[in-house]
């Protein structure tokens, strides 16, 4: 469908913002999530993965699925929002964006509930056989979200608009809603309401965890360390939601109403600008999610700490070698230096 470019607003700063932000997220996200999968493959045989580690692996896979589409979006925005790639890639990119967003929300939700149970009912949780439940819950989440996202694979994802100069046409990807479409509005209302229901449940669970941990007396240094890590994990999960997901879902409904022509046009540009910024924030969850793993698994922290210590040691040795070479080079011009014997 061809539309006149003057009939819609555009946030031109996104053609600079998205390529920069997405490039950084792509590099950091691939490294961080790839490393997480590699560590899990090395440290944990598949049959020894407990419930929470199963959720973490699935969360990492969801992040990687989105990360592999980022080069497509980088090309799109670098080309001033003109999709010249095959249409099915636009559908695929939109589908994986949806899958990553709501798989991340779902798996962070079940991870939080797992920790909530461990804090409130430690004996019952320790005695429970949770591996099968973790696999079953993961399958339910994937089936439900992939089924919902499959709509993006079959919908008409592209539309043609006039370019800024009016001298030709460009193809947009997932940037067109039919004016006054009530089905589109209902879908977005359901998505936003569903998200905030999950967010409120996560907020409740995390507040209970914080309250319970702070009330417990700390008698040993080890217990203090465990409590500190647990509190950091809770704060990190909440930070991921507040930074990445909440802003987008607060703006999503007003933006949808504006795109459908159901919102005052005087605010359309400001809402569209805010929407672009929240899309950038939404994608940062792929980089922040791996931080959570540091507080959840002892082996992961130990492995990461060992690698960091090796890197520091190698850098220190390199500096010592350089300094020694400098010190020995100075007296050569004056008097011979006896070789150092070990």
UniProtKB/Swiss-Prot annotation:
Cysteines joined through disulfide linkages: 90-173
GO molecular function terms attached to this record: G protein-coupled purinergic nucleotide receptor activity; lipopolysaccharide binding; lipopolysaccharide immune receptor activity; phospholipid binding; platelet activating factor receptor activity
GO biological process per UniProt: chemotaxis; inflammatory response; inositol trisphosphate biosynthetic process; phospholipase C-activating G protein-coupled receptor signaling pathway
Keyword Transmembrane: yes
UniProt keywords, alphabetically: Cell membrane, Chemotaxis, Disulfide bond, G-protein coupled receptor, Glycoprotein, Membrane, Receptor, Transducer, Transmembrane, Transmembrane helix
Pfam families for this protein: 7tm_1
Gene3D superfamilies cross-referenced by the UniProt entry: Rhodopsin 7-helix transmembrane proteins
InterPro entries in UniProt: GPCR_Rhodpsn, GPCR_Rhodpsn_7TM, PAF_rcpt
Glycosylation sites per record: 4, 169
Chain segments annotated as transmembrane: 17-38, 55-74, 92-113, 134-155, 185-205, 234-254, 277-296
The organism's place on the tree of life at top rank: Eukaryota
Function description: Receptor for platelet activating factor, a chemotactic phospholipid mediator that possesses potent inflammatory, smooth-muscle contractile and hypotensive activity. Seems to mediate its action via a G protein that activates a phosphatidylinositol-calcium second messenger system.
Complexes and interactors: Interacts with ARRB1.
Family stated for the protein in its record: Belongs to the G-protein coupled receptor 1 family.
Protein's recorded name: Platelet-activating factor receptor
Protein's organism: Cavia porcellus
């Amino acid at each position: 469908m061809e539309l006149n470019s003057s009939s819609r607003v555009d946030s031109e700063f996104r053609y600079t913002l998205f390529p920069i932000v997405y490039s950084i997220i792509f590099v950091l996200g691939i490294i961080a999530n790839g490393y997480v999968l590699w560590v899990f493959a090395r440290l944990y045989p598949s049959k020894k993965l407990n419930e929470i580690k199963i959720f973490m692996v699935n969360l990492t896979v969801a992040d990687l699925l989105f990360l592999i589409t980022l080069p497509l979006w980088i090309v799109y925005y670098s080309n001033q929002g003109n999709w010249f790639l095959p249409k099915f890639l636009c559908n695929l990119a939109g589908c994986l964006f949806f899958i990553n967003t709501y798989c991340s929300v779902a798996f962070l939700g079940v991870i939080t509930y797992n920790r909530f149970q461990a804090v409130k009912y430690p004996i019952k949780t320790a005695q429970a056989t949770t591996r099968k439940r973790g696999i079953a819950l993961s399958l339910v989440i994937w089936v439900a979200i992939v089924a919902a996202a499959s709509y993006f694979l079959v919908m008409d994802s592209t539309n043609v608009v006039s370019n800024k100069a009016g001298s030709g046409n460009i193809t947009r990807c997932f940037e067109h809603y039919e004016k006054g479409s009530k089905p589109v509005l209902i879908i977005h209302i359901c998505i936003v309401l569903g998200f905030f229901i999950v967010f409120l449940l996560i907020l409740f669970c995390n507040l209970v965890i914080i309250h319970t941990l702070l009330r417990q007396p700390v008698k040993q240094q080890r217990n203090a360390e465990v409590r500190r890590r647990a509190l950091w994990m809770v704060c990190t999960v909440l930070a991921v939601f507040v930074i990445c997901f909440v802003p987008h879902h607060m703006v999503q409904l007003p933006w949808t109403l504006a795109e459908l022509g159901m919102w005052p046009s005087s605010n359309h540009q400001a809402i569209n600008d805010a929407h672009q910024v929240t899309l950038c924030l939404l994608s940062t969850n792929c980089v922040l999610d791996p931080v959570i793993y540091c507080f959840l698994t002892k082996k992961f922290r130990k492995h990461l700490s060992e690698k960091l210590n090796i890197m520091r040691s190698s850098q220190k040795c390199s500096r010592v070698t350089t300094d020694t070479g400098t010190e020995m080079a100075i007296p050569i011009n004056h008097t011979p230096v006896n070789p150092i014997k070990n």
